[in-house]
Amino acid sequence: MRALTLLALLALAALCIAGQAGAKPSGAESSKGAAFVSKQEGSEVVKRPRRYLYQWLGAPVPYPDTLEPRREVCELNPDCDELADHIGFQEAYRRFYGPV
């Protein structure tokens, strides 16, 4: 077992040394802004999907939740709120106030 561990460590060390030998030297030869790219180059690399079909309308407004008023009524009743935590809001509302 020790021999296997030693062999694995030696192989890892050899790979690290070989990787450093093939790497570019850092310093004067490396370009000044190698870590940063312009916005144009970045947008060519990362193509974002178009989110909205009609750009001139702007961002779509999220749809209003039709159950929100009922959810607030259920939250004001401690028993309904506790039951909603266990079985879900719609079922708790139905049991206390009738069909949703």
Swiss-Prot record:
Residues 1-23 form the signal peptide. Its main location: secreted. GO terms for molecular function: calcium ion binding; hormone activity; hydroxyapatite binding; structural constituent of bone. The modification 4-carboxyglutamate is found at E68, E72, E75. GO terms for cellular component: cytoplasm; extracellular region. Ca(2+) 1 binds at E68. GO terms for biological process: biomineral tissue development; bone development; brain development; cellular response to insulin stimulus; cognition; glucose homeostasis; learning or memory; negative regulation of bone development. SMART domains: GLA. Keywords: Biomineralization, Calcium, Cleavage on pair of basic residues, Disulfide bond, Gamma-carboxyglutamic acid, Hormone, Metal-binding, Secreted, Signal. Belongs to the osteocalcin/matrix Gla protein family. This is Osteocalcin. It comes from Pan troglodytes (Chimpanzee). The gene is BGLAP.
